[in-house]
Amino acid sequence: YSSKDLKADRSFVKRVVKVGYFCKIESYTSADIKFVQGKTSSVRIEGTKSLVDNLDIKQNGETLVFTTKGRGMRIVGPARLTVYVSSPDITSVYLKGSGNFEAQSNIDTDALNVELSGSGDVDLRKVLCDNISLRLRGSGDVEAQAVDCAVANFELLGSGDLEVKMLKARNANAALRGSGDLDATLKGVADVKASLQGSGDLDLDFINCGNADIDLRGSGDVELKGTLRTLNTSKKGSGDIDRSQLRLAR
């Protein structure tokens, strides 16, 4: 298996792919996926002809799988290959490639699992769900504007950054084992458990949260800000825990 360079030609084309109901997406390509949660399931590909022709989309049950025909595809030049996708529900997104995933609408689902193993980025708007899992193993970045859920799990194993700009949840678990940074603002979260075993930095901003357990075993630094009721810390690594901007409101 080897990749080939595909230079964009001048012929811009659109292709509609007929699909049934799906709620999971897997991409192993350089294509950018733009998702909208809607009433129907649809797929539309836009790009230069050579790129569109080389993209293969198959449906395995409730999973939509994006691959390339023949050898791998690496896009050369300024052109991008874009896939516009809509579905009534989305529960899983897996990216292993240089392509990006962007949710162009809010997401309302029972559970959402997102895993990024490539160099592409994942951008989410507001997510409303019971459980969410964001896992970053690659060099790309994961960013969520707002998450409202019962249980949130964040795991960073790669060199990319993971940021959640506003999290409302009952319980939140964050684990940083890579060299990237993990930033989150948490509002009204009753119980927070966070561990740092890597070289990246962990930055948590609390807004009227309950208890937080912080475990530092790596060389990265932990910065805690905002308001908590109780805080428990454990430090065995070479990094520092900065709580100078944290207030405990008992």
Where are these regions (language model features)?
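Extracytoplasmic/luminal low-complexity segments enriched in Pro/Gly and acidic/polar residues
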Residues: 213, 217-225, 229-232, 239
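Glycine/small-residue-rich hydrophobic helix-like segments
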Residues: 176-177, 183-217
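Acidic (Asp/Glu) and glycine-rich low-complexity loops/linkers
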Residues: 1-116, 123-135, 143-155, 167-173, ...
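Intrinsically disordered, low-complexity proline-rich tandem-repeat tracts
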Residues: 95, 116, 136-137, 156, ...
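Short active-site-adjacent structural elements
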Residues: 204, 223-224, 242-243
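Short beta-strands and strand-coil junctions in structured, solvent-facing domains, enriched
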Residues: 33, 101-102, 121-122, 141-142, ...
